[in-house]
């Protein structure tokens, strides 16, 4: 297993600098990560550094609260794709989900999916922010995401009070079935963490500690 190809090399902190993003992109090229996951203002910079490589540019939409209007999320996603992003991680509207307005939640995801996929094979990951949800809400969010035509469910923003757990990843994998993406993010900091998430059903890992994870993985010769 090539662990690097399962990692979105991530830097989303609010005080990230251009030079830190450049370092992130260089590390992604060196280690062969699946993507870099960065804030929207850095998409053009990341694209300029990675356009001739296999590393994808991933950005976040409606981040980190998920509380923007549908129109705003669509605009943000389309703008990112026009600047070179080929993966978008959108935060679903947590308030609407918890209010039981499932039509809104599904429509929002559908609108973003439809808008970005008109530009090509863009991967859409939907962040559930599992730390705020009941088991029933997590399952419902997974079902809505799948029905709406997205490609992945993702656990967390990393900005909430809790990140990915093995239990949540197992539940999400069970809810979406085999042929769908599950991304574990938030608090995945070691090779052991990554292995636990993959064994639970994740096929993508979001982590700012990607380099450390790969180096530990190779040293321990995990499979």
UniProtKB/Swiss-Prot annotation:
Cellular compartment(s): Cytoplasm
GO CC terms of this entry: cytoplasm
Reactions performed catalytically: 2-deoxy-D-ribose 5-phosphate = D-glyceraldehyde 3-phosphate + acetaldehyde
Pfam families xrefs: DeoC (PF01791)
Alphabetically ordered keywords of this record: Cytoplasm, Lyase, Schiff base
Family membership: Belongs to the DeoC/FbaB aldolase family. DeoC type 1 subfamily.
NCBIfam families named in the record: deoC
Protein name: Deoxyribose-phosphate aldolase
Location of the active site: 89 (proton donor/acceptor), 154 (schiff-base intermediate with acetaldehyde), 183 (proton donor/acceptor)
GO molecular function, one term: deoxyribose-phosphate aldolase activity
UniProt cross-references to Gene3D superfamilies, sorted A to Z: Aldolase class I (3.20.20.70)
SUPFAM superfamilies to which the protein is assigned, alphabetical: Aldolase (SSF51569)
